[in-house]
Amino acid sequence: MVGYNFAKVRSSSKGGEEIRLSPLELFYKLTHPEIEHPRPSQLVVLEKWYAAYQSSINDNIVSLNTGAGKTLVGLLMAETLRREKGGKVLYVCPNNLLGKQTLDESKRYGLDVASYLNLDGNGAAWSKEDKYLANESVCITNYDAVLNSLSKFESHEIVGVIFDDAHIALELLDKQYTFSIENAELIKQIAMLFKDSPSIGYKIESLLQNDPQSLTMVPLSEWHDAHEEVKRLIIKSKAHKESGAFAWKFLQENLLHCLCFMGAGKIEISPLYPKSKSHYVFSKKIQRVYLSATVPNLGDITRVFGVTPKRIESESPDYRADRLFLFSKKIGLSNPDEFIRKSLSELKEKVFGIVPNKLSLLTYKTLGITVAEDSVAALEKILEFKSDKIQKLVLSNRYDGIDLPGAVCHILVIDGLPWQGDLKTRFFSEYFHNENNAFLRAIIAAKLVQAFGRTVRSADDYSIILLLDKRLNNWLLNRDNDKFFKKDIV
């Protein structure tokens, strides 16, 4: 890995005051003789972003392909903001694992950063907190630490935030304003309020029987009549004190303007538009950069974040990654998916798989393949997989936030169309039909692009991608969906 020595980029004046440099000027302070120029895509986005920043455009979404040096670009932007604005800057990662990877990369670049991460499983802890508080270092942290209702960063004078894998922030912020109920008795009490509903009354019985297919949204007119009683039941049960305290703090006075979704063993209440402007990260006039290998739907960003960012992209990729896509339906067997799954369990090579939900994990578990059913177990198993302690690993709904470069893994399995676990997205997905709705098709494509990048992390990397499940095969082979992908994929 190339070394950068940002520590030497200081003026010769007394006190060692830092020189204000553009991100490209910082880039050229290389200590490794083999690296003389940024990649074309890095050059383009850094120039475009710096011009937007100097024009006082506060929100910018920057898209770079997997393996194009997105992390370095983000760190250069963060360092530029810290130096020019003289304040605190956060570089926010999806999870602790990617936070650790970013921390390691920043050190190799010669960038002296602080961090607030949970690296040992014993809770989040500071590294170089004093340098961060003195505005001398960017802080690397994760989304949970920044977006939760008790964030320690809220009282800080933040001048800039870099959101890595920004689409994850969309989901997490939406979740912050969603009140979830899993108490069986409370679910029954609320559901029974609508047992005589002409619109959804017939669904209540299957819902209370925990039918996995049961899913509905309370009609707005009926929610208008029942929301006060729902509020009374929630307060009486004290469910608002058990979990979702932040969401309830906002929702309790705004229930009338919320949507209520009911599914097997769960009820979710959320506004159509999260009150993101009340969140300290989005309420202040600061620099926000949204990094992503895919360009999230700008309408969704506006809905969730309450901002309309400037789109910054490179016109063409630096390379076309070597990916071999194999479609199970093209094999010509009567049951190709079952054949491939069984063959994978017998394969000597390492294999990483992604399925849409926990139920789908059971198929692989019965074949003796390692699976992880929750986020804590997933992080543990990913580390074991990277260190070759296990050869096969399948996770549910983990289309992003995992880097498996080079020899770590060259075989990726995607088994099933991406599926989002929250009731709201599930409801709209089913109501509008995935295959026909442009908005939902864009979401599916974005998740698949993220998945394709798990095992291809650089220009000299390669991957075999096995695509299982009839619906997934048909969706990808439908040429009408090509427009939702970048040219380097289709």
Where are these regions (language model features)?
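Conserved pre-motif I regulatory segment
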Residues: K8-S63
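Conserved coupling segment at the C-terminus of the helicase ATP-binding
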Residues: F27, T31, L43-V44, Y50, ...
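Pre-Walker A (Motif I) flank of P-loop NTPase domains
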Residues: Q54-V62, G87-K88, S137, I286-Q287, ...
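Conserved Walker A/P-loop ATP-binding site and its immediately adjacent core
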Residues: T71-D120, D144-A145, T294-D300, I354-L361
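Inter-Walker segment of RecA-like/P-loop motor cores
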Residues: L97-Q101, S106-E157, L379-E384
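Short, low-complexity, polybasic intrinsically disordered segments
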Residues: K231-A239, W475-V490
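Conserved helicase motor "Helicase C" RecA-like lobe of SF1/SF2 P-loop NTPases
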Residues: P356-S375
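Conserved RecA-like P-loop NTPase helicase motor core
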Residues: E384-N474
